[in-house]
């Protein structure tokens, strides 16, 4: 929960994504600036918007405390033709982070590099959300485009 811990999670997440470009199918990159006094409420609103897309949250890690919930027995069967995972990375930084929309894999790679190089002293908040979370859980193509209409095919 401290800035060095958040920095480590951000770097680990962006590196994991950068190491799997063959798995990138869709992407969306957004960035914006808000006044400092609105930063927390804006971050919380974005977090709630993204988390509300989940059927349920199975694993959370807040302040280093991990908790699990949900019923792992009700998962669907994985199907290689329709199995997707969505990773959402929300970052609140003291400095402006200029990211461009990802029209292709190289632009996504550059945005991930920029995001991953955010200095720990600039990192105010971080949330990494992935869906699906459970073993064997499936996110179909229809569910993907319904929940994430801003995604662009790479």
Predicted regions and their residues:
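Structured extramembrane domains adjacent to transmembrane segments
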Residues: 1-145
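A cross-kingdom marker for long, charged
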Residues: 145-154
């Amino acid at each position: 929960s401290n800035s060095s811990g958040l920095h480590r999670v951000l770097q680990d997440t962006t590196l994991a994504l950068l190491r799997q470009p063959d798995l990138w199918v869709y992407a969306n990159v957004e960035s914006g600036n808000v006044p400092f006094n609105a930063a927390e409420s804006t971050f919380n609103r974005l977090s709630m918007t993204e988390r509300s897309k989940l059927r349920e949250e199975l694993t959370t890690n807040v302040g280093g405390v991990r908790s699990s919930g949900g019923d792992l027995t009700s998962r669907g069967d994985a199907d290689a033709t329709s199995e997707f995972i969505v990773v959402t990375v929300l970052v609140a930084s003291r400095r402006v982070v200029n990211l461009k929309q990802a029209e292709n894999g190289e632009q996504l790679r550059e945005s991930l590099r920029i995001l991953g190089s955010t200095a720990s002293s600039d990192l105010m908040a971080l949330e990494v959300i992935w869906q699906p979370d459970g073993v064997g859980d499936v996110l179909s193509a229809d569910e993907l485009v319904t929940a994430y209409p801003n995604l662009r095919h790479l």
